[in-house]
Amino acid sequence: MRSLPMLWFFFCVTVLIIGYFIYGKIIEKIFVINPKRQTPAYQVNDGVDYMPMSKTKIWLIQLLNIAGTGPIFGPILGALYGPVAMLWIVIGCIFAGAVHDYFCGMLSIRHGGATMPYLAGKFLGRPVKVFINTLALVLLLLVGVVFVASPAQLMGTITMDVFGVSQGALVLGDAEAVHHSVEAGGIKVWGMDKATVVAVWTAIIFAYYILATLLPVDKIIGRIYPLFGALLLFMSVGMVYGLVVSHFSATDPIEFFRTINADGEGLTWAKFTQNFQVKGDVPIWPLLFLTISCGALSGFHATQTPLMARCTENESEGRFIFYGAMITEGVIALVWCMVGLAFYENPQALQDAISAGCSMLKLCMIVRYIS
């Protein structure tokens, strides 16, 4: 049953899409939208944070805001659990993550583009507002560090890797040679070692974040974020294309789920369903849900939705923007979970990589290899 893993992947993607049209519509009815109600984008329209934008542009910005590197790194690590990881992404997205994001966005629209701490204080009292503000500050600090450090590490690795290619240090499929040369200081970029290159990228990304925050939303966020969001989608489509083409390759086929099929034989339904059960030292509960959070359910998204709630032109666009962006993030998470399942030769190789710490280099190598 060689096609079983591929069918499972596309089944999960299909369920997510169906969930958007069916359950998303149910959630929209529960909220009771009013298309005739003026949104904060028109009520305030201060030319800074509040201004109307097209729903496609807002959707791409919202996708990038809530996604980042979360639905890439988490699902790759979560691939250790096999196909049950993809089941969690589907269920989590449809019934929890997308619902959470939709209501956060729509509540913000209904209350003048208010943030979650303000809404918590309005309905639950000042003590709750203080608590949520403190919690949000701590979490945003932690998430901000990750969202600066992880791209900087990745870009630093890619920079050193590409420079290694230019020096002739990389032959086809020999990424480890470059890695060892980089770590040993044998490869430098303009006289800088890897740590310095990463520090430079960190400064660049941090400066970009500050600039994007201080300027009006349409100057940087409204112009650059949609492009980055489109690139995120394009990259995921490229991953699927690479997997499918490699899967049907006559010379070097890549099985979609080869990490759970160690004996090299065809994957049977019995073997497939074994991966929906607890596997001894890697219990599904609660580790799976902690490993894959951003791709299925994340409370951090509540801090991002007011940004786009202030630019939404009509309440009827909320399902596409907020619910739809989370469903799209779920699709991206499914793609990268499949990348993790297809990259390693067997379950032990994947386990060893995770046990040793899945560094940015290894994640970068996965992307390059599958591409």
Curated annotation (Swiss-Prot):
**Does the entry annotate any disulfide bonds, and if so which pairs?**
none
Cellular compartments per GO CC: plasma membrane
How does this protein lie in the membrane? Multi-pass membrane protein
Q: Which BP terms from GO are recorded?
A: cellular response to starvation
Q: Which Pfam families match?
A: CstA
List membrane-spanning regions: 4-24, 60-82, 87-109, 130-150, 197-217, 224-244, 282-302, 320-340
Q: What is its main location?
A: membrane
This protein's UniProt keywords: Cell membrane, Membrane, Transmembrane, Transmembrane helix
Q: Has UniProt tagged this entry with the keyword GTP-binding? A: no
Q: Where in the cell is it found?
A: Cell membrane
**Entry superkingdom:** Bacteria
Q: Which family does the record claim for this protein?
A: Belongs to the peptide transporter carbon starvation (CstA) (TC 2.A.114) family.
Against PANTHER family, the record matches this protein to: CARBON STARVATION (PTHR30252:SF4), INNER MEMBRANE PEPTIDE TRANSPORTER (PTHR30252)
Q: By what name is this protein known?
A: Uncharacterized membrane protein HI_1126.1
**What is the organism field in this record?**
Haemophilus influenzae (strain ATCC 51907 / DSM 11121 / KW20 / Rd)
Organism lineage reads as: Bacteria, Pseudomonadati, Pseudomonadota, Gammaproteobacteria, Pasteurellales
